[in-house]
Each structure stands twice: as structure tokens, then as C-alpha cells.
Regions:
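Active-site regions of metal-assisted phosphoester/phosphodiester hydrolases
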Residues: 1-141
């Protein structure tokens, strides 16, 4: 991760606490959408250049493990559901077009999977080093 061992330990402590909260949320059996720049990746394919993956932010074994555990516990990556093609990236740590990572996503309750209609990354205009993830859901509010 970024920021060294202290920052990584702090991040993993936070993720552990978040897991406890998300377990309670999941038990309510309602649909939840959590959007953000997670700075986590579940798969090496989420990095344009995963050659030295252990040094990439969000792709350490502990970070990947946390996210994969979350996905196996009743949550899903809405972007992968709406756009299963590889090679879509949302963050460029160096601020250029090289070394893209897909660290931003919508994490959703599995009961919302059938509601995902389309997913894409808005990259027509650079708004920052992150590109917004857009998901179209078929929901009635």
C-alpha cells in the first residue's frame, strides 16, 4: 500500500472494523450500494502493469484478501457485473495514462446484482487522477 507499514496497519484495522459493520448491514437483507475510491483491487487484472504487484497500492495479499472475503460474504463488485471486460482503469497514481489501476467501484449487496444494467468509466475528460465509475441500476426509489 501507499504510506508505508504504519499506514497499511491503520488501513487494515479500519477494514476489519468495516467488515464487522458490513456484516450487520448484510443481515438486514436490504440492498446497499457503497461507492468510493477504495484503493483496493481484487484481481491482478485490475492493474494495467501488475508485474510487481506487491508494491501496488491496493494489491497486497492482505488488501486483496479482505476484498475477496467481502465478495464471498454477500457483497459484489457492481462494475464487474455491468462491464466484465478487463482493461478498465479508474486511477493513475502518476497522473498520466500509464500504470492505471481499477481501485474505484460500487460494492453492492448481492440482491442488487440483477439490478445492474450497465457500467462504464467516464474518461472523456480528466477531472482528476481518478475517473468516475458510472453504474446504471434498475431501481425504484
Amino acid at each position: 500500500g501507499v504510506g508505508g507499514p504504519g499506514a497499511m496497519a491503520e488501513k487494515m484495522t479500519f477494514l476489519s472494523q468495516l467488515s464487522s459493520h458490513l456484516e450487520k448491514v448484510r443481515n438486514k437483507r436490504r440492498g446497499y450500494i457503497l461507492c468510493g475510491g477504495w484503493e483496493l483491487m481484487a484481481h491482478h487484472a485490475d492493474a494495467e502493469d501488475a508485474g510487481n504487484s506487491s508494491s501496488l497500492p491496493g494489491l497486497s495479499a492482505s488488501e486483496r484478501g479482505w476484498l475477496l472475503d467481502l465478495f464471498s460474504s454477500g457483497y459484489s463488485d457492481a462494475f464487474s457485473e455491468g462491464d466484465p471486460e478487463l482493461g478498465a482503469y479508474t486511477w493513475w497514481p502518476d497522473g498520466d495514462d500509464a500504470g492505471g489501476l481499477r481501485t474505484d467501484t460500487h460494492i453492492i449487496s448481492e440482491i442488487l446484482l440483477e439490478r445492474v444494467r450497465r457500467a462504464y468509466i467516464y474518461d472523456e475528460k480528466a477531472l482528476s487522477r481518478h475517473a468516475p465509475v458510472v453504474i446504471d441500476y434498475d431501481l425504484t426509489l
